[in-house]
Every structure is written in structure tokens, then in C-alpha cells.
Amino acid sequence: MQTQDRFMSPQWKARFKGYVQVTKPGIIFGNLISVAGGFLLAAKGDVNLVLMLASLVGLSLVVASGCAVNNCIDRDIDAKMQRTSKRVTVTGEIAVGNVLAFGLALGVLGFSILALFTNALALLFAVIGYIVYVGVYSLYMKRNSVYGTLVGSFSGAVPPVVGYCSVTGQMDMGAAILLLMFSLWQIPHSYAIAIFRFNDYAAANIPVLPVAEGMTKAKLHIVLYIAVFALVSALLPLAGYTGIAFMAVTCATSLWWLAMALKGYRHDVDIQRWARQVFGFSIITIMALSITMALDSQVIKEQVIGQTSLFTLVK
């Protein structure tokens, strides 16, 4: 009874909530969608549920680990930013050593699941993505270079590739398109955040593009990267990995996102509101494409099966 009371106490609930928060559940959820999209794109309707579950759980734990370790690394700059000043690693509600141990334990568990159930290539991408995010981006590039976003975009693009390679076990054109597509998406998404959180980044002396080189250059880069993202996204249907439904969705969302980005050049634009709109629609875009590439891939598989069966009957 005492044990049950202890677990129900406000202190324990607050501590549990703190451990959940350092894993950044919103980021985990977004990555779950992209992992599933990559997996189902490669599976084309022939889904191994055990493999899919292992890919989702394993990669989610790896992402959670990276986020927790990032909280430990960033605690000094988080203290200077209004948005992050209440994090438990800043307030001291949970000891940094405990958060680090928790994060590393999640990583070991996540990588172990991927190693046991997926394949060497999927595991390799997960490891490289983790090293880039924690070791290269968080420890150095974020604090010291305007190119930090470009480096970080690679790790952000890894989850759908892990999902895809879990099925195929090879780095083919589909995996390459996904890697490039999601890397390109990360950049305008991140620059939009940096614009509407400009004061936070400036206070922490983080050299993101809007802070280091100004709004004009940041707006130009947002427009250019969205335009290239739209072209690269169209490669999936053009290369035969998805069908007309994905092409329709990618054209509609990408062009709308691009039109929204171009509004940043209006003389009467509210730059903060505009950046939030660009950021918000970036989430809608990548979610829509992740879901559509999974569903459209299955439709193509069914069409192929149907045509094969008909051919057999006629023969």
C-alpha cells in the first residue's frame, strides 16, 4: 500500500512527467509517422507486423535517447531561452546525471531492438543519425556554425530511411530520395522556427541563419529549399515508387507551402506570424506526404497483383 501511495504522490508524478518531457514526445510522434511511411513505402502492402513494430519501437527509443542527451548538453543555452528555461535539466528538478543515464539506457535498448529485428543497414543509419545529432550537431555545430541546421537536417531525415531499409536491406534510389527529401524539408522548417523564436536564439548566441546573417537571407533560403523539396518529392512517383495520388498530394502541399513562403516578401508582412504559418504548414506537408506515400504504395502493389492474376487467367 505504501509503495502504491508513493507512486501516486505528486512528487513521483512530477518526476515521471519530467522524464517523459526530456524525450520530447512531439518529436517522437513526428518521427513515428515518417518511420511508418518509409516502412510501408518499401513494403508495398506486404507488411511484416513484427518487423514494423520493432522498427517503430526501436527507432522511437533511439530518438528519445538523442533528445534526452541533447537536453543534458543544451542545459546552459536552454537557461537563456524563454521557451526552454523551464526544462528539468535547467531547473534541476532531475539531476543531469540521471537524465543522461536515462537517455543512454533508452539508446541501448533502442539500438538493441533494431539490431535484433531489422538489418545491418537500418541499424547503421540509426547509429549514424544518432552520432550526427548528438556528437556533431548538439556538441559543436549548433553552437558554433551557421551551417548547424544543414548538418542537423541529416539526422532528422534518418527515421524514414531506417523504416525503408528495415524492409529492403539495401540503399536503393527510393532510400536516397527519402533521405534527400526529408533533409530538404528540415531546413525551411527549422529556419521558420528560428525566425519566430529569434529573440531566444539571439539571447543564447546560437548562430542560426536568421540571427547570424539576417532575415532577408533566411527568407530566401526558405523559399529555395521548399522549391527544391517540391522537385525532389516528385521523384518518388516519377521513379515508380508511388502513384498519381502521391503526386497530387505532393504538388498541392508543396506548391501551397511555397506560395506561403513567398508571402514573406510582402512589404506589410508580420514576420513572426508568417514564420509560424510556414512552420505549421511544414508539419502538415510532411505528415500528408508520409501517410500518402504509404497508402499509395499499397495501391500500386494491389494493382500489380490484380494485373498479374488477370494475365494468368487469360493465359
UniProtKB/Swiss-Prot annotation:
Its EC number is 2.5.1.141. Keywords: Cell inner membrane, Cell membrane, Heme biosynthesis, Membrane, Transferase, Transmembrane, Transmembrane helix. Pfam families: UbiA. It is found in: Cell inner membrane. It is a multi-pass membrane protein. The chain crosses the membrane at residues 25-45, 49-69, 87-107, 120-139, 145-165, 176-196, 220-240, 242-262, 280-300. GO terms for molecular function: protoheme IX farnesyltransferase activity. The keyword Transmembrane helix applies. It catalyses: heme b + (2E,6E)-farnesyl diphosphate + H2O = Fe(II)-heme o + diphosphate. One of its GO terms (cellular component) is plasma membrane. Pathway: Porphyrin-containing compound metabolism; heme O biosynthesis; heme O from protoheme: step 1/1. It comes from the Bacteria. Signal peptide: none annotated. CDD domains: PT_UbiA_Cox10. One of its GO terms (biological process) is heme O biosynthetic process. Belongs to the UbiA prenyltransferase family. Protoheme IX farnesyltransferase subfamily. Carbon 2 of the heme B porphyrin ring is defined according to the Fischer nomenclature. Converts heme B (protoheme IX) to heme O by substitution of the vinyl group on carbon 2 of heme B porphyrin ring with a hydroxyethyl farnesyl side group. This is Protoheme IX farnesyltransferase 2. It comes from Shewanella putrefaciens (strain CN-32 / ATCC BAA-453). The gene is cyoE2.
